[in-house]
Amino acid sequence: MPKPASSPTSFEAAVAELETIVQQMESGQLSLEDALARYQRGVGLLKFCQETLSGAEQRIRQLEGGELVELRIDTNADGSQECA
């Protein structure tokens, strides 16, 4: 029986692993069993990412007094960015 996969260490790590899983599955080189295992891992990673984003949104709402405010980012002529 395969050992359960560990939780990702960060949102970025989860996204990177998801990208790897997508590439592996799109290659068509996986057995059905391996493809199903990777799909299952991907579903878990997706859930982790959604929960992380939801938590970040809740923290932003608290910082903005309960109202979600659109953040506009302007790009300067030199390519740098600033919040407007």
From Swiss-Prot:
UniProt-listed Gene3D superfamilies: Exonuclease VII, small subunit (1.10.287.1040)
Keywords: Cytoplasm, Exonuclease, Hydrolase, Nuclease
E.C. designation(s): 3.1.11.6
Short name of one Pfam family: Exonuc_VII_S
Main location: cytoplasm
Molecular function (Gene Ontology), one example: exodeoxyribonuclease VII activity
GO cellular component: cytosol; exodeoxyribonuclease VII complex
Domain of life: Bacteria
The protein's enzyme class: hydrolase
The reaction(s) this protein catalyses: Exonucleolytic cleavage in either 5'- to 3'- or 3'- to 5'-direction to yield nucleoside 5'-phosphates
InterPro entries in UniProt: Exonuc_VII_S, Exonuc_VII_ssu_sf
Subcellular location(s) of the protein: Cytoplasm
Gene Ontology biological process: DNA catabolic process
Entry function: Bidirectionally degrades single-stranded DNA into large acid-insoluble oligonucleotides, which are then degraded further into small acid-soluble oligonucleotides.
Oligomer status and interactors: Heterooligomer composed of large and small subunits.
Annotated family: Belongs to the XseB family.
PANTHER family: EXODEOXYRIBONUCLEASE 7 SMALL SUBUNIT (PTHR34137:SF1)
Entry protein name: Exodeoxyribonuclease 7 small subunit
